[in-house]
């Protein structure tokens, strides 16, 4: 049986692949984001906090692969969407990537000194590294559902006509909060 590889078939295949990658990221890294977002609140003692970190430590680096592959799939299948979203939402992407970088740094440096103040600061850095991406990913879904203010010029170049604060509209925040809630309720 020959599979037709026309445009419609390829589009369905790419949507399925992208959906699988993003769902894989949400399921696997959502647990890690939830642990990080609840770090200052779930452990009463340093030992309880170390146990929470050790629950995700063996796998959290591998979970990031889903996110990287999702970005690569968007680039491969829809380069125009990739270019528009990554240039228009540059500051939001920078915010998310900074928080995603802060999380592994916090994992690494939290245990370097036994000082409680040192560990508390890194626990709050872990909180930021888990809270911000979960919220901003939910806000991104809200902006996709709501529609972002893009326009095309006469040469079909896209321009984003909004601002970073404009991305955090009430509707987008109301979709961001369930995104955050889904990451932290996995632990309950």
Q: Model features per residue range: what roles?
A:
Residues 1-62, 68-71:
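N-terminal signal-anchor module of multipass membrane proteins
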Residues 1-15, 75-90, 145-155, 163-173:
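Helix-coil boundary and interhelical linker segments in multi-pass alpha-helical membrane proteins
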Residues 14-25, 86-100, 127-131, 166-182:
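Alpha-helical transmembrane segments
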Residues 28-29, 33-38, 97-110, 182-188:
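Membrane-water interface of transmembrane alpha-helices
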Residues 43-46, 75-77, 102, 186:
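Hydrophobic alpha-helical segments
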Residues 59-132, 148-151:
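Membrane-interface helix-loop-helix modules in multi-pass inner-membrane proteins
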Residues 109-188:
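Long, contiguous internal "core" modules enriched in hydrophobic/ aromatic residues
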């Amino acid at each position: 049986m020959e599979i037709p590889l026309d445009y419609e078939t390829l589009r369905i295949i790419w949507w399925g692949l992208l959906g699988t990658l993003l769902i894989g990221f949400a399921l696997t890294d959502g647990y890690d984001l939830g642990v990080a977002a609840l770090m200052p609140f779930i452990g009463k003692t340093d030992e309880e906090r170390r146990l929470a970190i050790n629950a995700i430590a063996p796998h959290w680096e591998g979970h990031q692969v889903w996110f990287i592959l999702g970005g690569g799939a968007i680039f491969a299948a829809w380069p125009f969407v990739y270019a528009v979203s990554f240039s228009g939402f540059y500051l939001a992407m920078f915010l998310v990537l900074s928080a995603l970088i802060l999380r592994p740094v916090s994992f690494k440096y939290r245990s370097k000194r036994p000082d409680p103040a040192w560990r508390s600061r890194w626990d709050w850095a872990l909180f930021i590294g888990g809270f911000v991406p979960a919220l901003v990913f939910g806000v991104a879904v809200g902006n996709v559902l709501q529609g972002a203010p893009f326009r095309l010029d006469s040469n079909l170049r896209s321009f984003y006509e909004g601002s970073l604060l404009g991305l955090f509209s009430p509707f987008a925040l109301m979709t961001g909060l369930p995104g955050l809630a889904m990451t932290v309720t996995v632990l309950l």
